[in-house]
Amino acid sequence: MGKIYIFAIGGTGANVMRSILMLMASGAFPQKEIIPILIDLDENNGNKNQTLSLLSSYSQIQNECHGLINNQSGVFNSKLVDINNNGWEIAECSTLLYRKKYIDILEYNELIFDRYKYKKLIDSLFGYNEEHYDAIHSFFPKVDAQLARVAFDYSLSGNSIFEKIEMSANPDDMIIIIGSTFGATGKAGICEVLNEFKNRQLLQHLYKAVVLVEPYFEVDKHKYGEPFYYSSTNFIDYYHRIYSNSVNQTFQIKTQKSQYYPYHAGGVEQINPAHSATFRAALTVMSIVDNDGRENEIDFDNSEDCSIDVLYRYGLGDIAMNLSYFAVSCYIWQKMNQDFFYREVYNSLKLYDKLKNNTYVAFDRFVNEYNTWCNEMSKSNIHLFDFNATSLNELIIGKKYIPHGLISLFRGNLLKIYKDEMYRSFREFYTDTHVSNYPAEEMFFKIINSASMRVANEIINS
């Protein structure tokens, strides 16, 4: 079974990786070895830091409950691998660029040719403001990919991450690169990462796919200007002319731009919410992996933006059940925290001390992030599907309809059903000699997974 390297570039790449993690937690990518690599010139990018925190929570849960990885299905059963052994980010990118201006990287005063002539040329292309802009910022109108590529080349050259991939590469490994076509980091990063793979003979044979996320929101034109969209179109044309032949497949995520986001050049304020476009990109990655790179082009046109059927029509409906299991788990988990019915479970497994200090905290944090992610999706004006009672209900049961929606079941008998199933699962696991030898944290998640699946099946068969 090959390893899946996911290069998430810039804020959009990190945002897509966030959705991928939600899918992983719900049971997608079963038994796959996922190696996320976040690349961003901006050390304080909000989306990147949000995803790094989520990766940390997932990893902590996985480390405590490693046995779940061997299951054929269930929550948190994808193996998350930290190739750096100290975080999922190529830290050198932002570290090397700290307190540097683009002009420092260009070093055009040191050109060995006619210095005056080339100084004039560069000044005419970029101007004083762009040249003296902080190199760790990426979402800048005229700097765009030209200067960002110089910064990437400066920071990626000789980076050990590519040598590590070379040393451990297997023929069935996959490389998936995700980035936007509108931010300087995404455009520059995609090109420079592909250049790195081009220059490494041992990595030439690996399957490579690129997922391009096109503009899916509006920004204040007075602050950013028209080049936001023009540069995206120009980049896509450039990419297909120069790079598309060097990869196995390219996927373009298109959608209507109907939302306005505040303009931020970078830093902690650049944190865009989850959106159907970034979720589509995550589903595309899932489909690539599930089909071992044999997936045909997935084209969600604008007329299908509001159609729940899109998931099923493109063969992506299988994840619906996984999402429903995890959604039920997350909802009930929060309800359980207000209830003491499972005190016997805690006492028997001696979970009070362990979970409240370690796994409990990580899982609680992940559940809160999952709920935030769902809420952000529901506020998107363009929906692949709504994360509300009716459409979540449709996702779980296909075309069958439960009157008043899924949430009405939560408010009614579902919580009692879950309590009963939680207790029943606990008794089954705890009386099974083999299972009772599992570490307490691992047994805890096995119980949660078993009870969630039973409740979801109860909904389907009701």
Where are these regions (language model features)?
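Terminal, contiguous helix-loop blocks that mediate binding/assembly
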Residues: 1-25, 29-173, 193, 202-462
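Gly/Ser/Thr-rich loops at beta-strand to alpha-helix junctions
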Residues: 9-15, 179-190
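Short Gly/Thr/Asp-enriched flexible loops that form oxyanion-binding sites at enzyme active sites
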Residues: 20-21, 185-197
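Beta-strand elements within well-structured catalytic alpha/beta cores of enzymes
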Residues: 174-178
